[in-house]
Structures are given as structure tokens and as C-alpha cells.
Amino acid sequence: MANKREFPLEKTRNIGIVAHIDAGKTTTTERILYYTGKIHKIGETHDGASQMDWMEQEQERGITITSAATTAQWKENRINIIDTPGHVDFTVEVERSLRVLDGAVVVLDAQSGVEPQTENVWRQATTYGVPRIVFVNKMDKIGANFDYSVSTIKDRLQANPLPVQMPIGAEDSFEGVIDLIEMKADLYDEDELGSKWDTVDVPDEYKEDAQARRDEMIEALADVNEDIMDKYLEGEEISNDEIRAAIRQATLNLDVFPVFAGSAFKNKGVQMMLDGVNDYLPSPLDVKPYKATDPETGEEIELKADDSAPFAGLAFKIATDPFVGRLTFFRVYRGTLEAGSYVLNATKGKRERVGRLLQMHSNHRNEIPEVFSGDIAAAIGLKNTTTGDSLTDPKTPLILESMEFPDPVIQVSVEPKSKADQDKMDVALQKLAEEDPTFKAETNPETGETLIAGMGELHLDIIVDRMKREFNVEATVGEPQVAYRETFTKQVSAQGKFVRQSGGKGQYGDVWIEFTPNEEGKGFEFEDAIVGGVVPREYIPSVEQGLKEAMQNGVLAGYPLIDVKAKLYDGSYHDVDSSEAAFKVAASLALRNAAPKGGAVILEPIMKVEIIAPEDNLGDVMGHVTARRGRVEGMEARGNAQVVNAFVPLAEMFGYATVLRSATQGRGTFTMTMDHYEPVPKSIQDEIIKKNGGNAE
């Protein structure tokens, strides 16, 4: 091996910092970089000077859009941090990062506790089996309440929080924290930017409460750890090291989630939380081996973090950097990779050369000669690689489990302000779509207009903004439109026969296909049930491809057809005239013939909406929901506000921010996430079909 590994694997942590928007996540990351010696001057998000938020729009809006990956060192550990956005429109970034992380720090706002986006991220982290610790931030804020925040972890996330600290004071009088393991208090010196604190005995007025909380912590550990349980029941002394080891084990098993308290803005509690990252979150050796498939044999292989094995990694993000061009962020799961060497993009079956390797500190780059197992780095020079691709040693191709991304729910038309910019705009949109799998750009074949689709209004605003800043293309944006879908509600069989035999080589393809509604979210499933070669083997992929392409254009109003099973069960062919192209056309004809009898309906995205408004405006808010074809699912009091949970069609939510602001004098807020699809009412379906010039029944 050319270079020596700087940090052993067990001293490496790959973590994400995740939170609801405004819980203080970027500030927390800033402080981590400051204390780990990476930054000399702290940048505040409210000044637009934060180190991690490196795109101009992020600094202007004070929110984090792309996950910057940064490497830092704390005590004897290397910590690779991925900062992730908290706004729902950018959930894909979070999903992407959780895929390549081993652990996460979930930041909560001490006044609000668990918020809607926290629930989404928590659910995603549970899906990927990511161990977490929780940092209850903003303890200095008015209304900060540590115990309330901890209770929301139980109530809203159905998770098992394990407070390992308690705060000393709150709001203006928040002075520090008590470590419930060591039973010592850390009091901060206001003037020293949090780099100095005194560790003292627990103040008398807190002793009883702290002891009771320590006992609760040990009881909770005894429930999930037999050794602790035995000692606890026998009344034996349990050492602090044993407690820490038990917390680590329980955290890795997702049995508990250690909770810390602090205020990143006021520089309090961040270092203790970093100790928690080292003490409780996994190294690449602690996580379950990653699964990959051998493309030749289909055999499943476990990738263990091991520098001596052949290289395997996953590209999880593409970013365009103004100085070095296209950056491919990737995680190394096995082996090592040197700059200048070749890798195989096993997903696309193409060899690529890695020009240079960089490790990013926010958007500063350090060039490195080699990366090792468990590392996160960025490569320059990979031209064909996109998000979710597997990169491996050319001699041992492997396909790593890829990522699944949600479909866009909203679309707008865009046209360049000057016609001369059309080509420039096409290039810009293509580059932006490469970076972001939830963003799509397409041209409407009938009207010739360019449509862009994404996860929400903010998402598309930012895309249009980036076109202007990074590619100098100014665009006019149309009204937002809903990305509807279509599906079948009945089982139906239909024939598709395509015959052309007039002079020269003819065309012949004939298929019988049975279409059945599929479960929601299952997408398109194709089954080959041909017996006796009535449709030859080599034409079957063309039938599937023909269906997929035809489904993109729908059967009612031109929207993609989803959640349908298609079973090819009969057909015929011609020795000379049959071709792949003819069977492709035949498949699309079968779909068209099935449509009238398949009970086709238009589906609309239904959003899960959480509206927070003052008690006095509750009546207005309920009225807003019902007027928008929504249904209220539940209500709860949160502090002195009311929280209304509802399901509302996306089509009815455009412009709602303005309505809510004026009804509540600016005090109401709402968040929404895509939840599921539902058929639109018949009257609205007919309108949509008429507007799109489709086939109303």
C-alpha cells in the first residue's frame, strides 16, 4: 500500500447531522468544526457567513440545501460529517446521506421538540438502521424545555430516549450541563466562546434531581442489557466505564438514543456531544456489512470494511464546483483507491479514470493521494457516474444496493427570457438533473414547452435561481402544476397487434397482455407467462420496454401510468417480419386497447400537512382544510398554539402560505410532505382530461 492510513477504522466516524429546518443544525455543525480546529472564526447562519452553507442561495436564505461533506478530528477520532437540509423539499439529500452514514446526530429545538421534518428523517434513519444520538439545542431560547423535548421523542417518534445529561437552568439562566454518568457539572465561561468550562461537583440544589435521573438512566439500561440488569438486581456497584459500554451497545442496537443538551449558538454543550459521537456512535467496523451483488452470478456478497480487499464504493452525490468542475462524492465500503487509477462503474458497465481525490472541508478542498475503507471523499474525472452508481475494482465488479428516490410532485413550465438562451438552458437543466435525482426536466412534445418537476415550490425556485447564477440563464416561470399520475382500477386483458406488410420488409408483432392494478407504491411489474415460445424469448424485453415507454404517456390525459402489473400470456410471431420494434409497438397498442375497460383514473398527490396556528385561529384553519378538499386527522396543543394534522390534495395547497399568514397575522406556519396518491373526484378528472385534450370516458 502506497500510503499509511492516518486513523484506524475503529477511530473513524461517518455521521450526519439532521434536523427540522431552523433547529440550529448548521450552527451546530459550525461549532463542531470550530472546536475540532477546522475553522478560525465562527460563522453565524443569520449573518449568511456559515462555512457549511456554501451555495449563494443557501447563504441568502439561511437554509442548507446541499449536503456538504466535511472531515474533522476530535480527540483521537476522525469524524466525517455530512450536513443535511431540514426543509421537506430536500428530503432526497437526507435520504442520500443516510445511505452512506454509519450514525447520526439529531438536533432538536428545545422549545419545539420533535417537529414534522424530524419525524420524516427519523423514519428514514430507522429504515436504514442508523444509530442516533440526540442534541437538544437552543437551551438558551425563551420557552426552552429539556424534559418536554425528551417526552416528544417518546410520544411522536415512539423511540426510547436515554438522557445522559441534564441542563443547569434554561432560557437566559442556562449555564451548563450535568453529566449523569460522572455526576459532575460542566459550567461554561460566557466570554470564552465555549472553549473553556469548569468541571465541578454537582451544585447542591441539583443533587437530588440528578441522582434520581441517574438511577432512571441505569434502570433503562438494565431493561436492554443483561449484565447491567444482574448487577442492578444484586445491588452491585456499576462502574462508569460499564455504563458507557452498555450505552454504546444499546445505541448500536437501536435500543436507546442518548440525549445531550446545549446551545450551539451560545457555544455550550457541543464538545460533550462530540464525546458522545466518539463514545456511542458506530465505526465502520460496528455496522452490519453492506450487501452487494455479483452481476455475473447474481450471488449476494457482504462487504466488510477491509483495506486489503478489492475496492468497492458508492457514488452518493454529484456536485458542480465552480473551480474544479464535476465532483462525485463517494463512500468507500471496502478496499482502497489511489488518485489516477481506474475504477469500473459496475452499474453502467463503463471504466472510468479517477483524476484527483479530494476531501472536502465545507467547500475548501484538500487533495489526497489515496482513500481507505470507511472514508468519504470526492473524485474529479468521473464523467459517466451518477447518484447511486457502484464503483468497483475493474477486476471484481459488484453492484451495491442503489437508492430509491421519490417521484416529483409539482411541475412548472420554464422558458428562457431570450430565445438565444434555449440551448444554454437545456444544458443547465441537464446538469442540474444529474445532481438531483428528484428533479426532472422534459419537453412537452405537443407544445414544445420545457417542463421542470420537483418536490415542492422552494425546490423549483432554487433550481431557477441556480440556472441564473451558475449558468447565466434567466427564465420565465409558469404557474405551478400538479404532477398527476394515472392507474387502472380493474383487471383487463387486451390484444395488441401490429402488422405492416406492403412491399419490402414487413413488420409483425402480436401480444395478449393481462393488466391488473398493483398495490400503491409497488410501481410497474412485468411477468412473462409465455408458454411454448408463441412469443420468442428475444422479443420479450421489447414487450416490457414498449409497455414502459407507453405508460409514460398515460391513457387518459398524458400522465404516467403507475402501479400496474402486466402479464404477457399469449401472442404470435412471423419468422421473417417480426422484430423488436414491431413487438414494442404491439405492446403499446395492447395498453391503448386495455384502457377503456381498465377503469383508468387520474391520481393526485395527497400531502400530509401540519399547520401550527394560535388557538384563536383554529376555526379559520379548520375551514381552510375543508375548503381545500382536505380531511383533518387530528389536533393537539403544543405550547400556546394548536397543531392541526390533515391530508390535503397538493392541487389545493398552492399559495396557502399567503392565506395562512394573513389569517394568523403572520403567526401561523405549515409544513407538508407527499404522503400517497388518491383518485381525483370525477368532475375534476373530466376537467383535467378536457384541458389536456385527452380521452374522457
Swiss-Prot record:
GO biological process, one term: ribosome disassembly
Lineage, broadest ranks: Bacteria, Bacillati, Bacillota, Bacilli, Lactobacillales
Family to which this protein belongs: Belongs to the TRAFAC class translation factor GTPase superfamily. Classic translation factor GTPase family. EF-G/EF-2 subfamily.
Function: Catalyzes the GTP-dependent ribosomal translocation step during translation elongation. During this step, the ribosome changes from the pre-translocational (PRE) to the post-translocational (POST) state as the newly formed A-site-bound peptidyl-tRNA and P-site-bound deacylated tRNA move to the P and E sites, respectively. Catalyzes the coordinated movement of the two tRNA molecules, the mRNA and conformational changes in the ribosome.
Binding site for GTP: 19-26, 83-87, 137-140
GO cellular component, one term: cytoplasm
Main localization category: cytoplasm
Protein name: Elongation factor G
Species, as recorded: Ligilactobacillus salivarius (strain UCC118)
